[in-house]
Amino acid sequence: MNQTVYSKIISFLILVIFLSPLEAKLLKPSKNGEEKEILIVNSKRRLYYPIKSEGLHYSVKGPTRLEFITRYPVLKKKKQSHSFQYHIILNGKDTVDVNHRYKVQKTIKSVQHPKHKYTYSGNYFINLEKGVHTIELLKSNESKYPVLI
């Protein structure tokens, strides 16, 4: 293939990449999201919300793909892997039990809780269809500390 064909292919790929609608944003809870935890991850401040006993509530308009990024706090002296759980309730009827087990990541720090370390992130994806959806995140009874999302 000659150089003209390569340039047309590259131009087409660049055009497709820039015209495709890619968007990612942090969703704030519509209910019970007053308490926040700021973690320092790779020298950047990241905002997390703890899942307490009353849970977190979100209202989302679809179609969309949601990614739940969670971490679990542990005391600095603990070095082994830790398991943590939480529950996702979609539209008040469908329940998803999410279980993670991750090791402690040494590079993450908290401004509010300097004596804690945090696990590697546990990611969970949900695809939502068109329409308005309510999502409720609930704490598992087995977790000693609140899961951060």
Indicate where each model-derived feature is located:
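Short edge beta-strand/loop segments characteristic of extracellular beta-sandwich folds
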Residues: 69-73
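Bacterial N-terminal signal peptides that target proteins for export
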Residues: 2-10
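Bacterial N-terminal signal peptides
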Residues: 10-18
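Extracellular and analogous surface-interaction loops
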Residues: 55-66, 125-131
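Beta-strand-rich ligand-recognition modules
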Residues: 76, 90-149
